[in-house]
Amino acid sequence: MRTWKVNLASAGRCVVKISAMFAALFFLTVGSALAQPAEAGGEAALKLPDLSSVSFLGVNGHSLLMIGLLFCVFGLGFGMFIFMRLKNLPVHRSMREISELIYETCKTYLVTQGKFLMLLWAFIAAIIVLYFGVLRHFEIPRVAIILVFSLVGIAGSYGVAWFGIRVNTFANSRTAFASLPGKPYPVYQIPLEAGMSIGMMLISVELLIMLFILLFVPGDYAGPCFIGFAIGESLGAAALRIAGGIFTKIADIGADLMKIVFKIKEDDARNPGVIADCTGDNAGDSVGPSADGFETYGVTGVALITFILLGVKDPAIQVQLLVWIFVMRIMMLVSSALAYFINEAIAKGRYGNADEMNFETPLTSLVWLTSIVSIIATYIVSYFIIPNLGGDLTQWWKLASIISCGTLAGALIPELVKAFTSVESRHVDEVVTSAKEGGASLGILSGLVAGNFSAYWLGLAMVALMSIAYLFSGMG
């Protein structure tokens, strides 16, 4: 009887909490809606111009972006090719069993997360209907499109995260087996291939969805599609990223407790916490970042589209900028693949039969090679796509220079991070020496100093690059 009352009380508290959350969301939504002018509708009210109204290199914008779909298919094929290659690499039966056990545990985690996401989506869907349907008086089809594409966004984040887990668990056991002969190159090559597979798949899926909206959805309904898609992928990424981080910490602590209680080594096969720890690491370091990367790439695209449509009034210039942005995104995909193949040919020739190698060297060269190829492609594509933007013959190189500042940031950040975290870093040596000579307290203080110092240089680099980009933007 007492148990029944406790359960009833617990259920009652849950209902009260959910009701309170709904009430808070209701009043926040109503308040924000009343505070805005009647014509507001955000991205959902945006209308796309006719992409076929402007020609580029003798081809209208719609047809040019249709060609971009082929590059997306290429990216998907590239990702699947590496996926199958990793799957078919030699692996010891025991190693495969462990990696499959980790994958099955990760799968259970993802299924649970999927159910949780659907519960969250139900709350968000109610707010979407309330805001757009009741307060903004959108037509039922328009609200339905927002809801449908929010599910598409969730499915995108969730699907990429699942693909990432599958690829990584393939790569884990194959890398371990490839390391047995003692050659370092396979230990570098297999994880890098797994990362390229996930990255190419992520970008290709994202581009495919956004190009589908641009090319096949009527302009009046593109806004609801984009805002729904952005809401969905943001929701999926937030849940998978945060929950994955929490899960990995809990699993790691659990594995350590098992190690202490039973006095066994952390990676001992007799410690079942090791599997939980490995699952947690995959959840925190694969599921979360994969979904987060998908969301970041997509939301950035939606923001760029919104900025162009709101900041530019001339439909012809809108079309030029929209086509240019997406052609640039497609070319970045091609540049990444090209740089990867060139870098791998160099790395294999240099380290293929080596007994020792610095793993940071080919990774650093890949980052810089990708950045250089991307910057060159940025200027070339900009020159041919937007040579004359609104009567200005100089805008193409100014916009290309602004994008190149962002590309350069992607190369500089790893260099600055490496200066404070590399095995050959002077700061790492200082932290080790401090901990060795002065104990834990001095080691912690030394680490804090190095961390703050690194944040200073990273921040300074970002401010410098943003200032340079701002100077280009002010040139007219």
Regions found by a protein language model. Name each.
Residues 3, 10-26, 30-476:
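Hydrophobic packing and interface segments
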